């Protein structure tokens, strides 16, 4: 696909859920561009539409109305199989609950999406090994998920997401099931991926993690109500810490 223009372009995207004749407006007119190599945080309270927006970006759901363009291609009229193909090649997912397959080893979990892409055995081995090395989990390749800590499982999930070299990484509360130490370790890994050129869109309700992005997009009741640079939020947070007698964040 062509890389000119924004990687992601949303114009007036709306999403309505219908249950028992009740309409729930999850998204009410989203306008959003994400550039190649950008790190964007989608922030807001529970129920504001963050995960719905991420599902649409990842082609797991379709908008009720509006336009979604990915890499200069409209996704509006794609068949289910076309959406699945693009999702497998263009998008890497990182979930809150890791979603690793329990009876597969670490290596097999990372390799599996590459198998679905029809890659040769040698190419799968190369990419899987590189992905595990990138997240510091190559030494655990033969272990099962049950033999890993939560932080280690999330690292494996990140390796699985980046192994296919996707155009964008979509992370849905990637620190939600982790303690603060492991959460910060995963966020540092995300920052390393971004410094390496990855395009990242992360959903989070935690301002400590949102502020590490290039740009923070605030959602409330299905609308973008504010955008700010992550650096601005970091400056505010550091000043608050200083006034409270603590050192600046790293």
Predicted regions located by residue number:
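ABC family nucleotide-binding domain
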Residues: 6-213, 219
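Conserved beta-strand-loop-alpha-helix hinge in the C-terminal portion
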Residues: 223-247
């Amino acid at each position: 696909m062509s890389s000119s223009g924004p990687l992601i372009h949303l114009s007036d995207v709306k999403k309505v859920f219908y249950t028992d004749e009740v309409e729930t407006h999850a998204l009410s007119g989203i306008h959003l561009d994400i550039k190649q190599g950008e790190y964007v945080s989608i922030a807001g309270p529970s129920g504001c539409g963050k995960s719905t927006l991420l599902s649409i970006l990842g082609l797991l759901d379709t908008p009720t109305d509006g336009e979604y363009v990915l890499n200069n291609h409209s996704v509006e009229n794609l068949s289910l199989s076309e959406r699945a193909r693009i999702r497998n090649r263009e998008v890497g997912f990182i979930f809150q609950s890791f979603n690793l397959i329990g009876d597969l080893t670490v290596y097999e979990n990372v390799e599996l999406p590459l198998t679905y892409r029809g890659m040769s055995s040698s190419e799968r081995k190369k990419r899987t090994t590189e992905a595990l090395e990138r997240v510091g989990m190559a030494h655990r390749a033969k272990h099962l998920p049950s033999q890993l800590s939560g932080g280690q499982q999330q690292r494996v999930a990140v390796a699985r997401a980046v192994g296919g070299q996707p155009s964008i990484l979509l992370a849905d509360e990637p620190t939600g099931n982790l303690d603060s130490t492991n959460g910060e370790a995963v966020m540092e890994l995300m920052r390393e991926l971004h410094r390496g050129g990855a395009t990242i869109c992360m959903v989070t309700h935690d301002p400590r993690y949102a502020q590490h992005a290039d740009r923070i997009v605030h959602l409330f009741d299905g609308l973008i109500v504010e955008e700010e640079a992550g650096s601005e939020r970091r400056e505010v947070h550091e000043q608050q810490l200083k006034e409270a007698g603590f050192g600046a964040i790293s």
